[in-house]
């Protein structure tokens, strides 16, 4: 052994302070950067490197080089194997970036990571993140195409906000607070996933679609309010997403009215005191649940969107459905809506659509082939009753309940409850 050679891990252990001018403890870089806050590294080198940095720092400077260590897992291949030259299962990041984009690869790695756990790489996961980037890009283009040249950003007065505006602003406040809390706990994957879900499922799939009614309507004030909220929420969403997808967020941000020199210097939305309208949110979510149920029922019965019909809604929350008439017309394909606390009229030829907060009576039989629909329902009922019998027999068997894994028993009970619910709904309809 060469006495003048320092083992690689021991030389690496000196890195936190030896690169900053040490042993000159008056060096500017040393005083500014040492000690630092957080070290991010893999679990495979805790003993080799992390522990050596800590005891070397304490021994030579009297201070630990960092106060927090965030341990992440290893990126493995789609089969869970460690990537190696011998297996030939490694990836070239530059090739992935060329095909899917740097943001997509970055987002996939962040969403797939949980502290200390390994993750599996696959092109399909990167493709899903690229699809999200495309969704965001197209949504942003839609917003920009609907802005007049003299558009002034900023939220409208509260009395100009409708139920959907208050809902999206409240959801924005919630996701900003949740993502901030996740980041404070180093839960990057959870934070990124929540921001992605907000942008895709809440902003794109619901709010943008809802805004089209006002943007294409005759009420200029309502259209302007929708534009202002669209831009405001997009601006904040881009800032929330920026740490995870920096390139596309900067590009879109620069195209927004009133943007600064760079999104990187903008204030983090989670630090703002954004308002939540709890009552309006609850009302709007009741409306959304009902619309989803109607659309699912129509899809199941193969009813074309062009075929619209009247509906009666029985509910203890009439305000939500009375305020949402325009949304029911557009998204639940209603020609007219009657809201009542108790429906006592004829249900002949009607289909029931039930949610926790409402029951809809819809004359669907006039839009479909009655005999064909009855045959479909009977087939579904037979299947549900068969499942009912199978799960009931399993749970009535003492040997199964006693010897099967507890998780399997719970899953069987859940399947039985689902089959019971399905059979009851079919009979009710």
Where do the model's predicted regions map?
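The substrate-binding groove and active-site-proximal loops of carbohydrate-active enzymes
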Residues: 35-45
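Feature 926 captures the class I aminoacyl-tRNA synthetase adenylation module centered on the KMSKS loop
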Residues: 1-10, 14, 59-98, 102, ...
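Reverse-transcriptase-like RNA-dependent polymerase core
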Residues: 15, 19-23
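Short, solvent-exposed helix-loop connector elements
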Residues: 117-125
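Short glycine/proline-rich turn/loop motifs
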Residues: 29-36, 117-118, 272-276
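A glycine-rich, basic-preceded beta-loop-alpha segment at the flavin cofactor/substrate interface
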Residues: 110-111, 175
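Alpha-helical support elements that line or immediately flank enzyme active sites
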Residues: 47, 52-60, 195
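Aromatic-rich carbohydrate-recognition surfaces in CAZymes
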Residues: 46, 96-98, 104-110
């Amino acid at each position: 052994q060469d006495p003048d050679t320092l083992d690689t891990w021991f030389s690496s252990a000196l890195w936190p302070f030896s690169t900053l001018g040490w042993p000159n403890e008056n060096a500017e870089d040393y005083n500014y950067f040492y000690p630092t806050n957080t070290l991010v590294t893999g679990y495979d080198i805790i003993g080799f490197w992390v522990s050596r940095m800590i005891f070397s720092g304490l021994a030579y400077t009297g201070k630990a080089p960092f106060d927090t260590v965030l341990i992440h897992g290893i990126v493995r291949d789609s089969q869970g194997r460690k990537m190696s030259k011998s297996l030939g299962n490694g990836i070239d990041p530059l090739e992935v970036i060329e095909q899917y984009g740097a943001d997509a690869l970055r987002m996939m790695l962040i969403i797939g990571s949980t502290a200390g756990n390994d993750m599996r790489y696959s092109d399909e996961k990167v493709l899903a993140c690229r699809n999200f980037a495309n969704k965001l890009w197209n949504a942003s283009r839609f917003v920009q195409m609907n802005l007049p040249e003299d558009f002034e950003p900023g939220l409208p007065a509260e009395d100009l906000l409708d139920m959907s505006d208050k809902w999206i602003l409240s959801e924005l406040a919630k996701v900003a607070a949740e993502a901030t809390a996740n980041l404070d706990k180093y839960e990057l994957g959870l934070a990124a996933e929540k921001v992605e879900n907000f942008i895709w499922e809440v902003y794109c799939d619901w709010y943008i679609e809802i805004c089209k009614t006002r943007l294409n309507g005759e009420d200029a004030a309502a259209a302007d309010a929708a534009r202002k909220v669209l831009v405001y929420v997009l601006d904040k969403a881009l800032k929330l997403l920026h740490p995870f997808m920096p390139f596309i967020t900067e590009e879109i941000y620069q195209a927004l009215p009133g943007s600064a020199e760079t999104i990187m210097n903008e204030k983090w939305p989670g630090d703002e005191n954004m308002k939540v309208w709890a009552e309006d949110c609850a009302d709007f979510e009741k409306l959304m649940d009902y619309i989803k149920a109607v659309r699912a029922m129509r899809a199941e019965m193969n009813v074309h969107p062009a075929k619209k019909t009247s509906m009666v809604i029985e509910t203890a929350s009439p305000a939500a459905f009375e305020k949402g008439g325009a949304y029911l017309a557009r998204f639940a394909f209603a020609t007219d809506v009657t809201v009542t606390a108790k429906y006592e009229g004829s249900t002949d030829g009607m289909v029931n659509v039930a949610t926790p907060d409402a029951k809809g009576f819809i004359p669907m039989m006039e839009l479909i082939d009655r005999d064909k629909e009855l045959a479909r329902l009977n087939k579904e009922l037979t299947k549900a009753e068969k499942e009912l019998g199978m799960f009931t027999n399993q749970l009535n068997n003492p040997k199964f309940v006693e010897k099967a894994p507890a998780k399997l028993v719970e899953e069987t009970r859940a399947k039985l409850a689902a089959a019971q619910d399905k059979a009851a709904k079919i009979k009710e309809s």
